[in-house]
């Protein structure tokens, strides 16, 4: 129940943040607003003390690989408080379709340079406590981002 409420809260916050981001910074949100897209909300749970390493990997490497594979980020968030604020990273990516998402993730995961980065980032211990969770979202007819 707590996890479900957290996800609902995060999804609501992300939609609101997307709206605000679209008003303040039209790129890449405007691109993501193209009709027919599907949105993927990914939640990463880091091992205790490893959230800074996960964020560094995203900041320093992952975003570049996303760009390489035409994966546009909408935004990244961590919970504002509570125990999950120390271990959780949430972000949203738009995709033209689920099939495109699957193809992009396959290319991303198979990239030898990404594999080196992922391995190097974990020399001091495994970063993730579990596999990332992925939820695909369809925009509502009244959503400012579609």
Model-derived features: where do they sit?
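Bacterial N-terminal signal peptides that target proteins for export
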Residues: 1-12, 21
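An amphipathic, aromatic/His-enriched active-site/gating alpha helix that lines ligand/cofactor pockets
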Residues: 7, 18-35, 56-74, 94-136
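Short acidic-aromatic low-complexity motifs
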Residues: 45-51, 97
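A short beta-turn/loop motif at secondary-structure boundaries
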Residues: 79-85, 124-126
């Amino acid at each position: 129940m707590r996890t479900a409420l957290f996800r609902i809260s995060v999804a609501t916050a992300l939609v609101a943040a997307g709206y605000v981001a679209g008003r303040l910074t039209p790129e890449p949100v405007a691109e993501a607003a193209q009709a027919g897209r599907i949105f993927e909300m990914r939640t990463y749970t880091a091992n205790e003390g490893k959230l800074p390493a996960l964020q560094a990997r995203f900041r320093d490497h992952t975003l570049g690989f996303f760009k390489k594979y035409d994966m546009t980020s909408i935004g990244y968030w961590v919970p504002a408080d509570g125990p999950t604020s120390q271990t959780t990273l949430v972000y949203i990516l738009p995709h033209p379709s689920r099939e495109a998402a699957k193809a992009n993730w396959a290319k991303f995961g198979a990239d030898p340079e990404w594999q080196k980065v992922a391995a190097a980032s974990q020399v001091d211990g495994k970063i993730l406590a579990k596999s990332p969770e992925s939820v695909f979202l369809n925009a509502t007819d009244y959503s400012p981002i579609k």
